[in-house]
Amino acid sequence: MGGVDSDFFFWLVHAFFYTWLIFRLYFVFFLMNEPREEPESFWKNNYDQLSHIIFDAYGTLLSPSKYNIWQELGKRAKATREEVWRALAASDDLQEILDKMAIPKASQKEFMEKVRDDIAQIQPHPDAIPLLKYLKERKYSLAIDSFLIPLYAGPIKEHFSDYVEKFVFSFEQQHMKGESQHYFDLLQSLNIPAHQALFVGDHYRRDYLASKAAGMNALHLSNKWGKVGKEKLATLDELLTVLNI
């Protein structure tokens, strides 16, 4: 019996190890497929044939949201991040979302007021609209690519529809921002080769590294914390100096 128990334990340990290993490999190669570091082989930006400029939205053109709707909704509904994402991505009707997530009626009013106040306070950065207006006058085609949910799409269209030709929102895409295929889909939707596009954003991996990896030009609107791209902007209006226009 001792031998049987030992064999069982041996195979149990190995089964656990290989299950963990398979999960780990899946996580690394599929779930975390956005680049993590900037390879030395990345080419320098070349703006000679630039025709399209793609901007991130929140944190780049707009002040970021201050209310963590993901965390708050997950906590109140006792739901996973994936469950919260599915609910938020499916609708721009906050009442419908709260009902679907079984948020108690007693706390729905407070939650809705906080979200609406948060959305109302979102404003363009002071240099954003003058910059977009000038770029449009110089015949650049402008796009916005944002990782967001339907509730937060309104401020983007409200402030930038006069200047931006195309809006790309994560909840409308098969591949979300951060996934490598997202950037190839983006280029296809714009009907341009990668070298004619410039991506500008404040997220080191999703805006800078991932767009570079897809062959685009990219500029990192750097923060005072975290990693900073080799080709960067300190402020939005510095873009005009970089492009020499």
Please annotate each region the language model reported.
Residues G2-F8:
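Extreme N-terminal basic, low-complexity initiation segments
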Residues F16-F55, I129, K133-K136, Y140-I245:
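Asp-based, Mg2+/Mn2+-dependent phosphohydrolase catalytic module
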Residues N33-R86:
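Active-site neighborhood of HAD-like aspartate-dependent phosphohydrolases
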Residues P64-K66, D127, L148:
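Acidic donor-diphosphate engagement hotspot in glycosyltransferases and nucleotidyltransferases
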Residues N68, E72, E96-K100, K114, ...:
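Alpha-helical elements of Rossmann-like donor-binding domains used by nucleotide-donor carbohydrate transfer enzymes
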Residues I69-G74, L94, F111-I119, Y152-I156:
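Hydrophobic alpha-helical core bundles mediating ligand binding, dimerization, or RNAP-core interactions
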Residues A77-L88, A102-K114, V164:
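Short, surface-exposed acidic
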Residues L94-I129:
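Metal-dependent phosphoesterase signature
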